[in-house]
């Protein structure tokens, strides 16, 4: 019986590593998984491995994709003169739910945060700057989260992009300070984009 308890403990520990999952939720999920049919557990494990192994970064915007270029960058109907810069891929999902923004994106994969050991060179800022130098982008909307790290990242990006002669705007404050774009509702996101200000 000890080996069984050890296996359960290991599963709980792994589930706790997921964002937003505490010990009680991890425990609940672990016991749920153990009670699932073997074929369902296998399908879940295969889906996780498949997503992990087949997902890579878009060569243009650094969003997650299964091909070399994501479906947004390859869409000819998108407005290529405007790029919305976000911290994480899930921010793209949140902004796309609004169905109003028709430009392109760039995913930084984080925000500048020296206290958390996250520096500009660890983000995809160099890819963004090269992209801006090689294309006819007229406006960059900075849609980083309205927290200390997001504001620092926005200021840093604005200092780099403005000398390129590109208009730099920041999403409006409809999203609460300290909040994440990912969790905002569609109307709030739409108002934040519509009310963006030049920085």
From Swiss-Prot:
Positions the record marks as coiled coil are: none
**What gene codes for this chain?**
recR
Family, similarity comment: Belongs to the RecR family.
Q: What does this protein do?
A: May play a role in DNA repair. It seems to be involved in an RecBC-independent recombinational process of DNA repair. It may act with RecF and RecO.
**Species this chain originates from:** Caldicellulosiruptor saccharolyticus (strain ATCC 43494 / DSM 8903 / Tp8T 6331)
* MF terms in GO: DNA binding; zinc ion binding
Q: Which UniProt keywords apply?
A: DNA damage, DNA recombination, DNA repair, Metal-binding, Zinc, Zinc-finger
**Where do the zinc-finger regions (C4-type) map?**
58-73
Please give the biological process terms from Gene Ontology that the record holds: DNA recombination; DNA repair
What protein is this chain from? Recombination protein RecR
Q: Which InterPro entries match?
A: DNA_Rcmb_RecR, Rcmb_RecR, Rcmb_RecR_Znf, TOPRIM_dom, TOPRIM_RecR
Listed NCBIfam families: recR
- Start and end of every Toprim domain? 81-176
Recorded hits in Pfam families, A to Z, give: RecR_C, RecR_HhH, RecR_ZnF, Toprim_4
Instruction: List cystine links.
Output: none
Q: Which domain of life is it from?
A: Bacteria
């Amino acid at each position: 019986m000890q080996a069984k308890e050890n296996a359960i403990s290991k599963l709980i520990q792994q589930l706790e590593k997921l964002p937003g999952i505490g010990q009680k939720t991890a425990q609940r999920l672990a016991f749920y998984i153990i009670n699932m049919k073997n074929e369902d557990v296998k399908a879940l494990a295969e889906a996780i491995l498949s997503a992990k192994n087949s997902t890579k970064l878009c060569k243009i915007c650094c969003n997650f994709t299964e091909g070399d270029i994501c479906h947004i960058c390859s869409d000819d109907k998108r407005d290529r003169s405007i790029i919305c810069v976000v911290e994480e891929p899930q921010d793209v999902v949140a902004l796309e739910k609004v169905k109003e923004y028709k430009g392109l994106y760039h995913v930084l994969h984080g925000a500048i945060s020296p206290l958390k050991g996250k520096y500009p060179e660890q983000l995809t800022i160099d890819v963004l700057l090269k992209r801006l130098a090689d294309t006819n982008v007229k406006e960059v909307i900075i849609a980083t989260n309205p927290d200390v790290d997001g504001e620092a990242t926005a200021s840093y990006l604005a200092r780099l992009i403005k000398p390129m002669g590109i208009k730099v705007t920041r999403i409006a404050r409809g999203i609460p300070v300290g909040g994440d774009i990912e969790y905002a509702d569609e109307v709030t996101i739409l108002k934040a984009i519509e009310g963006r200000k030049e920085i």
